[in-house]
Amino acid sequence: MRKHGWQLPYHPLQVVAVAVFLALGFAFYVFFAPFVGKKIHQYIAMGIYTPLITCVVGLYIWCAASDPADRGVFRSKKYLKIPENGKFPLAKDIKDGCGSATGGAKSHDGTCVEDTENGSNKKLESSERSSLLRLLCSPCALLCSCCSGKDESSEQMSEDGMFYCSLCEVEVFKYSKHCRVCDKCVDRFDHHCRWLNNCIGKRNYRKFFSLMVSAIFLLIMQWSTGIFVLVLCLLRRNQFNADIALKLGSSFSLIPFVIVVGVCTVLAMLATLPLAQLFFFHILLIKKGISTYDYIVALREQEQELEAGGGQQSPQMSMISSFTGLSSASSFNTFHRGAWCTPPRLFLEDQFDVVPPENASVSSYGKKSVVEERVKKKPQPVKISPWTLARLNAEEVSKAAAEARKKSKIIQPVARRENPFVGLEASSSFGSSGRRMFPTKYEGVNNNGKQRRQSKRIRLPAELPLEPLMNVQTKAAMETSTSSGLAPLQLEARSAFQTSRAMSGSGNVMVTSSPESSLDSHDIHPFRVSSEAEDAAQLNGFSSAVGLMGQQRGQQQQQQLSMMMMPLSRSTSDGYDASGGEDSDQVPSRNIHKSR
């Protein structure tokens, strides 16, 4: 679990950001400010630039050093580094390491003492570094504590109760989000900034926004001063040769000076563009009252809708396309026929491509493969675009974020986790109307609190012969001395929750299904009973009932043999599933429903 951005390992973008700002600051005081003209101009330039760079450095250090984690994370075992057994194995490891060898006891004891001394020295060095870092960040901390408002923890606790994070194993607030990079829950999570190597949440969002504004002004000051110096260098070339030799040394000529100033100016201009784009993006976020995480969730939801719709645009997409002024009949569409028309990538970096037509198959197997590809496909990273954000509806974005929180398997409401398995559930298996009074291991509770049943269904292949079934039924018929015209009954697993309707004394063999049955009506093909069998069953009702009860033993033995060749398929739906699969309308299915 990462506590702050200065914790090892550093991100490469963090190293780049620190190096660029240090290089720009050094270049301004050495190559920019001394060559702006008169002394008064130099003092003005340094007087403006110095507070800006001080503010940027201080805010950067403070934003990266702050811990935006949820309050509950501070009490977690991961944050406190407490093992699961609650015991610290430090002393035990030292003891085991010291007493592991018997032959060279003295040498091992010496190495153990050295290891403990090295560990204590490292701890002292780390404590000194942390105290030095706190001393450097104390002015920024004082400024930020004065500017920050009151705590809103009581307000969050009153909103829909508390939530539980299964990864942090603590209770968190409603709008907290678990960051996979930092491996902790962040209070009012906005995004994970790779340039800071830290998460941005409620605790450091204001500092992050202030850092953005200060950095933009600093970069504008940098490249505007650089352009001014380059113009003066072209106009006063002879004077600049003398000034360069006087202030930088005789070995430094005009050409290297122009190269250094030009490179730093271009670098500052290039850094200003994405930073200004990010600034306007967060201005729109604040205006709409949403976060960066909500924006990302909404765009991914739109991508899924486009893929599921087969190229049809959602209302929000159509509205965006109408604002951009590019229609589907434009010349851009000739190069991207299967894609939704978007502005150039300079203004809108995300393109919402639909599924290509060749990937979609008419057959049911093709549809299944396309769905599996969509499920297995990892979500693409969403790029920041103020143009897209300006055309999004804030209410729809909030709804998408709320649905994402409801579907989350990591952070769930406390009430949802403590919801017991109560209630009655009808069990339907060929006409049985029994009810289960206790939950099984195949039952669960979905997000809405309703019960859900996962049934196991056995499907007979079409090429399976009916001779074993006929032999079992013929043997049972010979034992009961009934008419030989009885057709073999459909084999069924004996369930403890079935009623005796199927084994009643009546001669008619009824096969019924309740609305909750996982077998569809068009897939059920029970064996018909002849008229002779019906008459014989009516005359010998009692004897047939006794015979059917005795028949169950033979059926169970035969079923155990046949189940070894039967492919199992589980239904994870809410009670309804296409039992025939892809070949349901080609081969008559003989299904055996087994419920637990």
From Swiss-Prot:
Where do the record's region annotations for Disordered lie?
A: 102-125, 433-455, 498-523, 549-596
Broadest EC class?
transferase
Instruction: Name a GO molecular-function annotation.
Output: protein-cysteine S-palmitoyltransferase activity
User: What's the EC number here?
Assistant: 2.3.1.225
Domain DHHC: start-end pairs: 163-213
Q: What is known of its domains?
A: The DHHC domain is required for palmitoyltransferase activity.
- Cite a single Pfam family from the UniProt record: DHHC
The cellular location(s) given in this protein's UniProt record come to:
Cell membrane; Cytoplasmic vesicle membrane
Enumerate the InterPro entries for this protein. Answer: Palmitoyltrfase_DHHC, PFA4/ZDH16/20/ERF2-like
Q: Which reaction does it catalyse?
A: L-cysteinyl-[protein] + hexadecanoyl-CoA = S-hexadecanoyl-L-cysteinyl-[protein] + CoA
What GO cellular component entries does it have? cytoplasmic vesicle membrane; plasma membrane
Q: Which residues form the active site?
A: C193 (s-palmitoyl cysteine intermediate)
* Purpose of the protein: Palmitoyl acyltransferase.
Name the residues that span the membrane: 15-35, 44-64, 215-235, 254-274
Topology relative to the membrane = Multi-pass membrane protein
Q: Where is the composition biased (Low complexity)?
A: 549-571
Which family, according to the similarity comment?
Answer: Belongs to the DHHC palmitoyltransferase family.
**Record's keyword terms, sorted:** Acyltransferase, Cell membrane, Cytoplasmic vesicle, Lipoprotein, Membrane, Palmitate, Transferase, Transmembrane, Transmembrane helix
Organismal lineage: Eukaryota, Viridiplantae, Streptophyta, Embryophyta, Tracheophyta
Q: What is this protein called?
A: Probable protein S-acyltransferase 22
Q: Where is the composition biased (Polar residues)?
A: 498-518
